């Protein structure tokens, strides 16, 4: 009985939704089906008692069944109530793609012949629409796990080692509590990098004029935070932008907001800071940005971001990481369209930063 309660709690906490269905299916496999032979299976979130009663993610499963008296029949009559209790909590997840929009149809989109490989990591879509996620044409996606709040169109084009689930609960914004430091005074001059075959360096600071890197030119960013206040970052195809320990913050006001466009075959090697207020974040979009602001990161196989791309109000078009040399790329945006084949991984221990979603659960009581 205790094994049934333990496994039921772990399964329900890992699933994150349809808790009663998950727990009851598992306990029934142990021979304890709710309502059969006086068995009761009770599922509570949060738990009704114990150290985790105030944890909204904790799941409690109680399996009960009256047992006939044996020797105790000498001292009383009637069956003896026997119960087993278990509590499990979800572990931090291994998500690498999260679409935050709650109603877009779809919030995650992939079509044509594009192939997306999420190496050992999960994809989530918070949209309750049907479809919440679309994999059209002959496009394919491979992941560890796919979980969407709504429905999926093209599920047959998805390969997921640990399953594909619809109707799951929304995943919390992993960077909701992160805010960069106050920005310094801005340089309003437009910066254009034209020198083919040469490297131009840029220091951290605030830039309110556009930054353009033309084909054949290279822009090297020194470590630090770069604020693009109403300014666009434009990296042409066959241009190069590099930097270690950098965060690009796109902000603005009114009708003027920073955005980015990276052309096909641009060479991008940007790595997030491993400490500090923007730890683990390589691109950060202001939460006050108008919903639907367009970002186009379409460098393809030569586009490598090490860290999180966090654009909570952006419609992000993404293509990158084919043959990637980085092992840590997370994409969090309002909506996400894969416009080309991409490889993403989340071996991010060296950079730190927030985990996305849940993966497994562990027993705590």
Give, region by region, the residue ranges found by the protein language model.
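Aliphatic-rich helix starts adjacent to a transmembrane/signal segment
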Residues: 1-5
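Short amphipathic secondary-structure patches
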Residues: 7-69
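Extracytoplasmic/secreted envelope proteins and their assembly/folding machinery
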Residues: 20-27, 83, 120, 306, ...
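Glycine-centered secondary-structure boundary/capping sites
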Residues: 31, 35, 74-78, 139, ...
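Primarily marks folded extracellular/lumenal domains of secretory and cell-surface proteins
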Residues: 41-42, 91-365
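Small-polar (Ser/Thr/Gly)-enriched, low-hydrophobicity segments
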Residues: 43, 54-95
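Alpha-helix initiation/capping motif
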Residues: 46-47, 67-69, 82, 173, ...
């Amino acid at each position: 009985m205790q094994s049934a309660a333990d496994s039921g709690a772990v399964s329900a906490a890992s699933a994150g939704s349809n808790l009663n269905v998950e727990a009851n299916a598992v306990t029934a496999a142990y021979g304890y089906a709710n309502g059969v032979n006086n068995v009761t299976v009770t599922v509570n979130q949060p738990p009704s008692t114990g150290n985790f009663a105030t944890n909204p993610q904790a799941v409690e499963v109680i399996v009960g069944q009256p047992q006939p008296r044996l020797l105790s029949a000498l001292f009383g009559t009637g069956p003896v109530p026997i119960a087993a209790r278990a509590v499990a909590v979800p572990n931090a997840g291994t998500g690498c793609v999260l679409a935050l929009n709650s109603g877009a149809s779809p919030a995650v989109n992939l079509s044509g012949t594009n192939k997306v490989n999420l190496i050992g990591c999960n994809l989530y879509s918070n949209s309750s629409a049907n479809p919440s996620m679309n994999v059209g044409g002959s496009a394919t996606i491979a992941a560890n796990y796919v979980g969407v709040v709504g429905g999926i169109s093209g599920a047959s084009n998805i390969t997921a080692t640990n399953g594909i689930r619809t109707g799951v609960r929304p995943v919390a914004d992993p960077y909701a509590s992160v805010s960069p430091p106050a920005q310094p005074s801005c340089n309003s001059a437009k910066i254009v990098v034209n020198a083919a075959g040469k490297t131009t360096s840029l220091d951290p600071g605030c830039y309110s004029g556009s930054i353009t890197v033309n084909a054949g030119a290279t822009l090297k960013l020194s470590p630090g935070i770069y604020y693009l206040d109403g300014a666009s970052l434009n990296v042409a195809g066959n241009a190069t932008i590099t930097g270690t320990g950098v965060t690009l913050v796109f902000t603005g006001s009114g009708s003027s907001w920073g955005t980015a466009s990276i052309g096909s075959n641009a060479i991008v090697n940007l790595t997030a800071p491993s400490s500090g207020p923007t730890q683990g974040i390589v691109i950060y979009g202001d939460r006050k940005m108008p919903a639907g602001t367009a970002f186009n990161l379409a460098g393809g196989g030569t586009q490598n971001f090490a860290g999180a791309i966090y654009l909570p109000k952006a419609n992000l078009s993404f293509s990158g990481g084919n043959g990637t040399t980085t092992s840590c790329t997370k994409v969090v945006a309002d909506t996400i369209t894969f416009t080309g084949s991409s490889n993403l991984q989340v071996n991010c221990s060296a950079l730190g930063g927030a985990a996305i979603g849940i993966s497994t659960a562990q027993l705590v009581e």
